[in-house]
């Protein structure tokens, strides 16, 4: 293998996929990048066996093609210290590569590409769909915080992608809160779905940040591929059945609170400072035209109270919530005005953007109350 490439371009490509490199692995070969040079394209692979990232880097000149595995940490650390300049990389012998730059060089070990595990993709029966990158990023951002850490029910540890002929909905829940994010322009001929674990979802979100086109998604019963720009992400899906989330969305909550989202969020945060740190319990007392928010920690003899104006219609209601859950939902909405719909103090509240907001119909949250 022998090629010349910009140090900056090589570093950028490696950093984009380095999130898949494990800190330590039962398979030490996975602590390496797999370099595959064909013509003037260097395909680089990083994997932890569950999550694989591939990218293509255009090199300036190629004198000898080849495939080798290169220590990820060493080559990244070296490139980080180099200013932007051409770098010549070549195999020096059967076990090492040489990196030459303007004023010096470095020798690193490499390992046979044959030792690198084969990365399997999807089968011939894979479903395929295009997803706008900005909508996918927003959908993951809007739901990932609601995923669970549940060893008994692994399906709850990921984001559920629910495709249909009408729309696509991303869903996440930890049994205390549930978030749905709907993208109406993404549709499939028939209903289909998959569950993406929160870890690859977070990686996908971070590397999608610079994309503004469409993401091609292909998936079967066990694997999903995301392709965008020069990058491909391959990961295993969570196998299992996701709960029937639509059945728990309240339909007839008749008591309605309409309030400025930022004001509500800031008030809850202030009052929650005095909430018990174990329960994070706050209490909302709702009456037409006003809402009182209180919290206390009897162990430390502290309490907080604040009254704010609001648009509320319905019976007077006293209801308790875990403040951290309520602030998470409010903070991850971008609407100006939020609507909360209640049935009573024991049943879940529905949290949605106001009907006149552009976010209306796109996102909804469901939050279980706690005993007052």
Where are these regions (language model features)?
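Structural preference for solvent-exposed beta-strand-turn elements
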Residues: 1-372
